[in-house]
């Protein structure tokens, strides 16, 4: 059975981790994995297909549990309902502090055996290990490193604007003004709290990684209430003037489509957006440009899709470990992340198969990891527990929508974070 499980997992692991601990009651019986995830958009679904096909080729059937909603909030709601009902999925896509919450409850399994054997400690960046381990034990397998401080620009629109990529705030505003003059929507944006916060992440990071760390990771009241933070909110107000009237509630992938179709100039979004461009047959450097938000070069705010394994009966543990192993295999890390638009969760995966944006992502992550500027994203659950993140979301969204002045937003931010700690 061990051999069969090994085949089943090698390269499908992600699927499996995604899917989790496949129920393996009998080696003769077809194995099955049940996967709770929120990869439902075009590019994400393509990446998931890599996993499904790999699983199928190993004789493992797939029970899909997709939950729409890019931030994963809805998926967590479904998961809590399942666990409360005593029917947890075997593996679940999770982010940051959500993993810690389940680990604190003693609900997750232990992957130490495979992690130790394969030397995960040496190849998975320390900032990721802070979430993939709990009390010194591995409880999740990181699938990727998504970075959030990206801009995705329509190349034709950029060329019409002179072709210069903006490297600072003033150049960004000049570019957005040019897009407006071209008669297209300057910024493609979806008015959802997590999307507003994704822009705010990059804006705050543009004031320097030290400031970002003090404000969003250390939650330093002085940084949160500073004039620098007020400037960040002022910039959000300015950016708000470049979105279209119909932005409220728009899903992120529909905003990506606006840039892809030339209806908008730029989207501020994590590198999962690249999957949408690729799905539409677009090529980096020819049809679109990927670059870091101006002022954030040399730093990376990340989130990482991980698959947390729930505690399972003894007979299911071997499959669980085999699948975790498969997820971390360099071959799978490369194949999956090429399609997903992310960088591998390991620093030793060659960039050979990656396109220009992928190569840049891998290089940026390595640089940031070595400089100590690989920082957990506030907007995506890698800087703070959910209560704090949601408190920040609330202030950011109200300010972005004109319900708070920058001065009031700074005051509310300090109070909201303090109350949520």
Curated annotation (Swiss-Prot):
Keywords assigned by UniProt, alphabetized: Periplasm, Signal, Sugar transport, Transport
Protein's cellular compartments: Periplasm
Keyword Transport tagged: yes
Leader peptide range in chain numbering: 1-27
CC per GO annotation: periplasmic space
Pfam families linked: SBP_bac_1
Keyword Signal: yes
Family label: Belongs to the bacterial solute-binding protein 1 family.
Described function: Part of a binding-protein-dependent transport system for a sugar.
UniProt xrefs under PANTHER family: ARABINOSE-BINDING PROTEIN-RELATED (PTHR43649), BINDING PROTEIN COMPONENT OF ABC SUGAR TRANSPORTER-RELATED (PTHR43649:SF28)
Protein name: Probable sugar-binding periplasmic protein
The species this protein was found in: Brucella suis biovar 1 (strain 1330)
High-level lineage: Bacteria, Pseudomonadati, Pseudomonadota, Alphaproteobacteria, Hyphomicrobiales
């Amino acid at each position: 059975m061990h051999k069969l499980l090994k085949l089943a997992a090698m390269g499908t692991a992600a699927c499996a981790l995604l899917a989790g601990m496949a129920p393996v009651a009998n080696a003769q019986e077809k194995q099955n994995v049940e996967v709770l995830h929120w990869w439902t958009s075009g590019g994400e679904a393509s990446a998931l297909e890599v996993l499904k096909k790999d699983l199928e080729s190993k004789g493992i059937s797939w029970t899909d549990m997709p939950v729409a909603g890019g931030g994963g909030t809805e998926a967590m709601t479904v998961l809590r309902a399942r666990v409360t009902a005593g029917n947890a999925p075997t593996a679940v896509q999770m982010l940051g502090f959500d993993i810690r919450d389940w680990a604190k409850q003693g609900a997750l399994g232990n992957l130490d055996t495979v992690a130790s054997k394969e030397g995960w400690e040496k190849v998975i960046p320390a900032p990721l290990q802070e979430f993939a381990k709990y009390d010194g034990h591995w409880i999740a397998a990181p699938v990727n490193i998504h970075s959030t401080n990206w801009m995705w620009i329509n190349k034709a629109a950029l060329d019409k604007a002179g072709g210069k990529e903006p490297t600072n705030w003033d150049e960004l505003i000049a570019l957005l003004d040019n897009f407006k003059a071209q008669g297209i929507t300057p910024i493609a944006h979806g008015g959802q709290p997590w999307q507003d916060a994704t822009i705010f992440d990059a804006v705050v990071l543009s004031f320097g990684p030290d400031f970002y760390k003090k404000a969003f990771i250390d939650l330093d009241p002085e940084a949160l209430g500073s004039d620098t933070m007020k400037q960040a909110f002022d910039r959000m107000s300015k950016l708000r003037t470049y979105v279209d009237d119909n932005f409220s509630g728009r899903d992120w992938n529909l905003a990506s489509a606006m840039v892809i179709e030339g209806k908008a100039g730029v989207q501020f979004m994590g590198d999962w957006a690249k999957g949408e461009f690729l799905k539409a047959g677009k090529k980096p450097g020819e049809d679109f440009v990927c670059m870091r938000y101006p002022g954030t070069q040399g730093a990376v705010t990340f989130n990482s899709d991980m698959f947390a394994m729930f505690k399972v009966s003894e007979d299911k543990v071997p499959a669980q470990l085999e699948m975790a192993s498969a997820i971390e295999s360099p071959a799978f890390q490369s194949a999956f992340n090429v399609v997903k638009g992310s960088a591998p969760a390991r620093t030793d995966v060659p960039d050979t198969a990656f396109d220009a944006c992928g190569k840049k992502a891998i290089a940026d992550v390595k640089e940031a990891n070595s400089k100590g500027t690989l920082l957990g994203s506030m907007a995506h659950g890698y800087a703070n527990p959910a209560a704090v993140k949601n408190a920040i979301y609330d202030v950011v969204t109200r300010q972005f929508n004109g319900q708070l002045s920058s001065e009031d937003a700074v005051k509310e931010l300090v109070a909201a974070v303090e109350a949520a700690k």
